Amino acid sequence: MASRSFSADGSDPQGLAVTSFLLLVKVSWRNVWRNPRGTLLTALALGLGLALLLISLGLLDGGHEQTIANGVRFGPGHVVIQAKGFQDSGSQELLLPARVVSTINEFLQTEPMKRVLLGVSPRLLATGLLSSAANSAGVTIIGVIPREERAVSLIPQRMVAGKYLSDDNPAGIVIGAEVARKLEVKIGSKVVLMTQAVRQPGTKVKDVTPGEMQSTLLRVNGIFRTGIEGVDANVIHLPLSVAQTLLGVPDQQVTQVALFLRQEGDSLMVAKGLRRQLAAAPVEVLTWRESMPMLAQILGLDHAFNYVMNGVVLAMVGLGILNTILMRVLERRYEFGVCKALGLRPVQLAVMIIGESLALTAMSLAFGLALGLSIDHYFATSGLDLRLLFRTSLPSTIVLDPILYSRLSVSRIVSSVIIVFIMATVISFYPALKAARTELPDALKVL
């Protein structure tokens, strides 16, 4: 049997230590409720701070998730493969070789890629002039495969008049609402699209001279409105085959292949795999952060701003807690003097104050979690209608749906609780030190 040591008077030191600790815990809990009003107000302040932190983080992550999703679906996708140098120059002369497009298609058919891939959209990009009987407008031409584009892009979902492109209507074109307003056209109107033909060396295309101006007659099939000025006033979609014929590009060649993934977090992995597969080809494989650096920078700045604001809120809550606990300590100097006179050591006094703070923090965290998660659940299911904040419509620079949904992860919840708990614990050290250093003569002067 294990032996236990006893002191000279027959007492058990370990048992006394445990009893003393439990007694301090009991006293700390009772002290918390000596001033119920102050306790509840402090718990309310700290709980509201945690709830506000959880709500803001949930809406922040949800907003960023929606912004990224909309950005990539209005833009070049989560991952884009294009000719080397196209990102910097934007030259319509830079096309993906047919063999590269074939290699990409083979790679995308592998089992690992099928699991992460949502859709693929080959695109041919160029600039041109769109004219009607009333006016003309410079536009960005995007040749797409209607079936593929409809599955991944948001533009087919933002039609305000007419319908999106279809395979059985090769002469159809869809244009932005601002383009339609400038050209004074409506559904069914005839427009002429003019652009400069391109041709890669060594290719045989229909009678098209490189650099020659080409034009074609099209009919407005649909009008879309995205809320993004740069898209609505500039972008037009037409069938890929029509764009290839107009530009004198072989059927197998496109400007870029846009990949859309089920999870944004897989972007880097997919990009690395494609870079290995296409290492010898004159192409560049970019994630959305590289193809849309402005969007990535805006999200980064928004993250930083929100962290600063959350830090300010927590600092204000922390100062309030410090003030409350410190006032409690100063009001109880006589009590601490009596405790010291009865033999309570400074360390035990400090432990008692820290125990009070931890008990108060535990109650605050429970309240904050209940309140924060309840409100977050509402925002996650019903969403926050941003139109209530902007009265009418969203600013054209915001790439968001009108309804913002919260996305609060478990890691965010755990980290928030840990941060608030550590903050409250550290704050309690100074009042505890103040109580431990109470001098008996000074404490009795309170009388």
Task: Locate predicted features.
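C-terminal membrane-exit region of the final transmembrane helix in multipass inner-membrane proteins
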Residues: 403-447
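N-terminal Sec/SRP start-transfer signal
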Residues: 2-54, 347, 442-447
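Hydrophobic, regular-secondary-structure patches
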Residues: 57-140, 163-169
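Mechanotransmission and gating elements of multispan inner-membrane complexes involved in transport
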Residues: 197-201, 207-306
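Hydrophobic alpha-helical transmembrane segments of multi-pass inner-membrane transport and secretion
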Residues: 36-63, 300-334, 358-371, 418-426
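Transmembrane alpha-helical interface segments in multi-pass membrane proteins
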Residues: 326, 335-380, 415
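Short helix-loop junctions at transmembrane helix boundaries
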Residues: 367-415
